């Protein structure tokens, strides 16, 4: 639990430190980044990035889920899997305007999954590709 709180604090500090001045409310950009067993990023920012590398997302089946990230700067990749019902519910709540933070255990199972949906995140493009 303490580690989950630490990851949430790191994510919140990232949001605060990357905040840009905006005319109509606070806005932040959260590019995909990966560190030791921890990944984060906003779906809309990854999709709108100038590079063709960064990616973050999660998917589920009836009984399991997987989160995957590719860091634009280093092209490192990360993934974790889960069968935890609470984590699956969080993964299923992801929208195109969400930010995802996940961490994993040494065996590749998801330790934590956090989903943020907020007005300060970039809205998803409405025009598609």
Explain the meaning of each model-derived region.
Residues 103-112:
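Short, charged beta-turn/beta-strand-edge "cap" motif at the junction between a beta-strand
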Residues 76-89:
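Beta-strand/loop nucleic-acid-binding surfaces
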Residues 116-129:
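Short peripheral tails and domain-boundary helices/loops at the edges of structured domains
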Residues 22-66, 70:
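N-terminal secretory signal peptides
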Residues 8-17:
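Bacterial N-terminal signal peptides
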Residues 86-101:
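Short nucleic-acid-contacting surface segments enriched for D/E, G, S/T with interspersed K/R
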Residues 1-8:
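Bacterial N-terminal signal peptides that target proteins for export
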